Swiss-Prot record:
Domain of life per record: Archaea
EC number: 2.7.4.25
Major location (coarse): cytoplasm
Record bears the keyword ATP-binding: yes
Annotated gene: cmk
MF GO annotations: ATP binding; CMP kinase activity; dCMP kinase activity
Reactions listed under catalytic activity: CMP + ATP = CDP + ADP; dCMP + ATP = dCDP + ADP
InterPro entries assigned: Cyt_kin_arch, Cytidylate_kinase_dom, P-loop_NTPase
GO annotations of cellular component type: cytoplasm
Organism: Aeropyrum pernix (strain ATCC 700893 / DSM 11879 / JCM 9820 / NBRC 100138 / K1)
Subcellular location: Cytoplasm
Keyword Iron: no
Protein name (record): Cytidylate kinase
């Protein structure tokens, strides 16, 4: 399980870890973005809709819990670490300062920096609010994680080596 805010690198590391360990890969962010695209909404608009309609998050979480219960998977999700903390073998939090993450998001999505900043701030606020309201989860409590890495401090390779070493030490 690799968790972190938008643009922290969780998808990059989760995909690679899944491949190297011969496991499946599952991303709640990809599902959220595809639902937004299907509805013709921006991520900020989709986040606002999810604030009003808990069924969106609950459906994504139901699917995630179902996938996790089968095992053999690396999950990339902001919230699932808290939902699965008692079941997951390895919980990793990747993080980076907001300005680093916004630059990454703007580059990844091909959008202007200002738009990436506005959408990221709104999305994070919405997630924090929804997670607290729906689940009583405070995403600032990071004590559940086995490993926390600031991805702005290390190269992609060095960060990945830390994550992989942690996985090996946990018997994965």
């Amino acid at each position: 399980m690799i968790s972190g805010p938008p643009g922290s690198g969780k998808s990059t590391y989760a995909k690679r870890l899944a491949e190297d360990l011969g496991l499946s890969y599952y991303s709640t962010g990809t599902i959220f973005r595809s639902i937004a695209r299907e509805r013709g909404l921006s991520l900020a608009e989709m986040s606002r809709l999810a604030e009003e309609d808990p069924r969106i998050d609950l459906e994504i979480d139901r699917r995630t819990l179902d996938v996790a219960s089968r095992g053999g998977v690396v999950i990339d999700s902001h919230l699932a670490a808290w939902l699965l903390r008692d079941k997951a073998q390895y919980l990793v939090l990747v993080k980076a300062p907001v300005w680093v993450r916004v630059r990454r998001i703007a580059r990844r999505d091909g959008v202007p920096l200002r738009r990436a900043l506005a959408e990221t701030v709104e999305r994070e606020w919405s997630q924090r609010l929804r997670f607290k309201r729906y689940y009583g989860i405070d995403v600032s409590d990071t004590t559940i994680f086995h490993l926390t890495v600031d991805t702005s401090m290390y190269s992609v390779e060095d960060t990945y080596r830390l994550i992989l070493e942690g996985a090996r030490r946990r018997g994965l």
